[in-house]
């Protein structure tokens, strides 16, 4: 049996004319977090991702939020996806697949992950409210598009039921954390879970 070393960590920095982001991720953490994105709603959602996924996340971001939250949200998704990919390396010995149903009061979402090196996002979670606090609800999809592209994951997000936009998005972030934690669990075999021998 192959034992995956519990030291899957990464650190990514990204600076553009629009954002300046530093992120540290520990996939074998305990849900510890220190998050300051400048976007209060996104802080809340990423905290939930960290806690419910047992992932340690340190994140500081400065962006052009005087314009809107788009660049900051998308670029954090880019950096988080890169951090996941870096921490996992060749993805050898992990479960690779995971699916989670997660409720939040009346909201129920399904998150399915394949850490396949084939980036793809299916997103079907309509939120009626255009704003969640001051946060544009359409940015949730842009965030997960960036994460999936940079992490090299196939990611399906579906809302089964839901009325309250905050509940729907909260369930998505919690569910993503839980699904990711399951997909990276040790499988007990060497190499990638693929008939090709690699991903």
Swiss-Prot record:
PANTHER family: IMIDAZOLEGLYCEROL-PHOSPHATE DEHYDRATASE (PTHR23133:SF2), IMIDAZOLEGLYCEROL-PHOSPHATE DEHYDRATASE HIS7 (PTHR23133). It catalyses: D-erythro-1-(imidazol-4-yl)glycerol 3-phosphate = 3-(imidazol-4-yl)-2-oxopropyl phosphate + H2O. It comes from the Bacteria. GO terms for biological process: L-histidine biosynthetic process. Disulfide bonds: none annotated. Belongs to the imidazoleglycerol-phosphate dehydratase family. NCBIfam families: PRK00951.2-1 (NF002111), PRK00951.2-4 (NF002114). It holds the Pfam family IGPD. GO terms for cellular component: cytoplasm. GO terms for molecular function: imidazoleglycerol-phosphate dehydratase activity. InterPro entries: IGPD_sf, ImidazoleglycerolP_deHydtase, ImidazoleglycerP_deHydtase_CS, Ribosomal_Su5_D2-typ_SF. The keyword Transferase does not apply. SUPFAM superfamilies: Ribosomal protein S5 domain 2-like (SSF54211). Keywords: Amino-acid biosynthesis, Cytoplasm, Histidine biosynthesis, Lyase. Pathway: Amino-acid biosynthesis; L-histidine biosynthesis; L-histidine from 5-phospho-alpha-D-ribose 1-diphosphate: step 6/9. It is found in: Cytoplasm. This is Imidazoleglycerol-phosphate dehydratase. Its EC number is 4.2.1.19. It comes from Desulfotalea psychrophila (strain LSv54 / DSM 12343).
């Amino acid at each position: 049996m192959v034992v995956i070393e519990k030291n899957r960590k990464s650190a990514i920095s990204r600076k553009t004319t629009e954002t300046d982001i530093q992120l540290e991720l520990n996939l074998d953490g305990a849900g510890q977090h220190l998050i300051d994105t400048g976007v209060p709603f996104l802080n809340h959602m990423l905290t939930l991702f960290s806690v419910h996924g047992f992932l340690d996340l340190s994140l500081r971001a400065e962006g052009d939020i005087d314009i809107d939250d788009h660049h900051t949200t998308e670029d954090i998704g880019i950096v988080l996806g890169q951090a996941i990919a870096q921490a996992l390396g060749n993805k050898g010995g992990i479960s690779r697949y995971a699916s989670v149903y997660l409720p939040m009061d009346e909201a129920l979402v399904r998150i399915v992950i394949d850490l396949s090196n084939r980036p793809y996002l299916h997103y079907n979670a309509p939120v009626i409210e255009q704003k969640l606090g001051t946060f544009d609800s359409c940015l949730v999809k842009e965030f997960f598009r960036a994460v999936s592209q940079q992490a090299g994951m196939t990611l399906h997000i579906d809302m089964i039921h839901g009325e309250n936009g905050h509940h729907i998005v909260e369930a998505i972030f919690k569910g993503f954390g839980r699904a990711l934690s399951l997909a990276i669990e040790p499988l007990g075999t060497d190499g990638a879970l693929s008939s090709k021998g690699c991903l």
